[in-house]
């Protein structure tokens, strides 16, 4: 049994990584409990197959020490701080604890991967995803590789007519960042230089809030806003399968 604890503090990023990891472990026939403290966020990116997966269970964090038995392995994603009753449960079951860290290409990942750590009376081990054979590597799903291989077909994919555009589309994903004005200005100049028009897909949540704030707009899901040669299209968040297709088929992300 592998138990993954996710604390959603970073839009869809934390939940997305944990979901991909859980799904990949299930593909290896591991039984996975994915505990998330924000089910509304994770529900927006799960695939239909996830809800039917007999190896994957997605639920809220347990509220009592004895409400779940954390056997075998516990993965703490991105320095998540767990309640004391969960640590007591871990100690009781003598589970292996892994601290999943953020993906980085920095050299320190080679040295820190698999290092032990001691906290709350529990020994845990750091797991650093990365790009060398001294790190934990990357989670790359088979379906993603197939889509990458068939990229030319994806370029023609219109996502059920959601994002029709005669030229090219760009996906814009951001957090609170005032540089969005600078990015749009440069994209406008680029579009004019190439004599092209671009559709920019902006997803609901923090990316849309950031855009509205810095452009003094009030866009919502389904709206389209014209900015010179750019057409800003607001989309609901899509599941990871469709998001992968969007990324692969887009002009730039």
Where are these regions (language model features)?
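Structural motif
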Residues: 1, 72-73, 96, 169, ...
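Charged active-site motifs of nucleotide-sugar-dependent glycosyltransferases
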Residues: 1, 165-170, 197-199
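Donor nucleotide-activated moiety binding/catalytic core segment of transferases
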Residues: 61-63, 201, 208-253
């Amino acid at each position: 049994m592998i138990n993954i604890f996710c604390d959603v503090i970073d839009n869809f990023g934390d939940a997305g990584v944990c979901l991909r990891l859980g799904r990949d472990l299930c593909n290896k026939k591991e039984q996975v409990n994915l505990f998330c403290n924000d089910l509304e966020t994770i529900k927006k990116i799960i695939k239909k197959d996830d809800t039917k997966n007999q190896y994957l269970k997605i639920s809220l964090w347990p509220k009592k020490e004895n409400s779940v038995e954390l056997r075998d392995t516990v993965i703490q994603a991105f320095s998540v701080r767990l309640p004391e009753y969960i640590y007591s449960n871990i100690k009781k079951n003598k589970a292996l604890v892994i601290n999943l860290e953020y993906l980085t290409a920095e050299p320190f990942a080679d040295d820190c991967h698999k290092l032990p750590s001691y906290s709350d009376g529990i020994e845990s081990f750091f797991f650093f995803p990365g790009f060398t054979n001294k790190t934990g590597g990357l989670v790359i799903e088979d379906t993603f590789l197939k889509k990458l291989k068939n990229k030319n077909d994806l370029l023609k994919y219109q996502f059920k007519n959601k994002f029709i555009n005669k030229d090219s589309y760009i996906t814009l994903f951001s957090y609170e960042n005032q540089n969005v004005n600078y990015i749009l200005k440069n994209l406008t100049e680029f579009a004019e230089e190439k004599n092209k028009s671009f559709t920019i897909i902006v997803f609901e949540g923090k990316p849309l809030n950031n855009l509205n704030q810095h452009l003094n707009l009030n866009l919502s899901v389904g709206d389209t806003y014209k900015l010179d040669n750019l057409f800003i299209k607001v989309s609901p968040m899509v599941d990871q399968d469709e998001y992968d297709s969007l990324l692969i088929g887009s002009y730039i992300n």
